[in-house]
Design a protein with these regions (language model features):
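Non-catalytic alpha-helical scaffold/packing segments enriched in small hydrophobic residues
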Residues: 99-103, 119, 160
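Acidic two-metal-ion nuclease catalytic site recognized across multiple nuclease folds
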Residues: 2-3, 142, 162-185
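Hydrophobic faces of stable alpha-helices that mediate helix-helix packing
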Residues: 133-136, 140, 158
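Substrate-binding/catalytic groove segments of enzymes
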Residues: 131, 146-147, 171
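Short alpha-helix plus adjacent loop in nuclease-associated cores
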Residues: 116-134
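Conserved non-catalytic scaffold segment of RNase H-like nuclease domains
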Residues: 2-112, 138-142, 146-152
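Short, glycine/acidic-enriched loop or turn micro-motifs at the edges of active sites
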Residues: 15-17, 122, 160
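Alpha-helical transmembrane segments that form the membrane-embedded catalytic/substrate-binding core
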Residues: 154-164
Length: 185
């Protein structure tokens, strides 16, 4: 697998729940690893009356005060500035892509069809005998990746996900009975 930093950006979203149809997209973060350029943007509450995930992502209703909807001009600039039309967008799980797709659809924003996502969590195979310990944080600790934090900010998660992607080095992981096996590609 190609690990050239200039071929990727990392996307992380913070949300108000797990349903991209019922829960708000609270923030969007995009990290360009070769330049270390970072985009981090709060969005207003629309679908929910309050923020229910503050203990996970640290985002409060006060943080969102004055936040504005994403505009088509901002989307176009983001696609251009972060070269999203030519880079693969890395995500750790399918939630990020799903929330972006449904936000674009709800707001009538164009450009989602230009984006190419790769959910590298698909390279991690875990059995039902793993005891629920296969978290991004635990994998980062296993690979000695620093700066794992209790609060999951989009900006920090983007950097952690990039470091984890590099450490996996294109290998698939098999996790069973709390043991981790790297499988060669």
């Amino acid at each position: 697998m190609n690990l050239c930093a200039s071929d990727y950006v990392v996307l992380d979203v913070e949300t108000n729940g797990l349903s991209s149809l019922r829960d708000d997209l609270l923030s969007i973060s995009v990290y360009q690893p070769d330049t270390q350029k970072l985009y981090n943007r709060f969005l207003p509450l629309e679908l929910n009356s309050d923020v229910y995930t503050t203990d996970i992502n640290g985002i409060t209703k006060k943080d969102l005060k004055g936040a504005k909807l994403l505009t088509q001009e901002e989307v176009d600039a983001l696609i251009t500035d972060y070269e999203l039309q030519r880079r693969t967008i890395l995500t750790y799980g399918s939630l990020d892509e799903r929330f972006i797709r449904n936000y674009f659809k709800r707001k009538g924003l164009q450009g989602f069809d230009k984006l190419r996502f790769f959910n590298f969590k698909r390279n991690i195979i875990s059995s039902r005998f793993s005891g629920g310990n296969i978290t991004k944080d635990n994998l980062c600790r296993l690979y000695s990746i620093d700066n794992v934090q209790a609060l999951h900010t989009g900006a920090n998660d983007c950097i952690l996900e990039w470091e984890l992607f590099k450490k996996l080095d294109g290998n698939k992981l098999l996790i069973t009975y709390d043991k981790v096996f790297e499988l060669n590609p």
